[in-house]
Amino acid sequence: MSNNKMSPEPMFTRGDVAKILNVTPLTIANREKNEKYPEPARDLNNYRVYTLNDVFNLQLITYSSLDPRPIISVLYDKGYRDTKELGKLIDGVLTKRKGV
């Protein structure tokens, strides 16, 4: 991925989600296995992929609150550099969540 190019919807790996939630990837795997976390979608290679909305859901399940800061940090590490676009992306997901 180019450092300044935003894809329409960022996808996260289990490792990314573990960093965001401050847990190990094994913890996430165990919680999925025990049905405490919903099973994520899979990509063409059958790897688990998590959307931004999935990550917010897991934050709510884990901590009963939403905090976009660790998500922004991981997105930045993945090459998302445009903070304005990151803000719009996160605001868009949060706005949709409030409307539901």
Enumerate the language-model features and the residues they cover.
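Polyanion-binding surface elements
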Residues: 2-31
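A short, Lys/Arg-enriched interface patch at domain edges and termini
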Residues: 55-85
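Major-groove DNA-recognition helix of helix-turn-helix-type DNA-binding domains
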Residues: 22-48
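Compositionally biased, low-complexity segments enriched in small residues
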Residues: 1, 23-26, 53, 84-86
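Short helix-start
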Residues: 11-14, 38-63
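Exposed, interaction-prone assembly regions rather than primary DNA-binding/catalytic cores
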Residues: 84-100
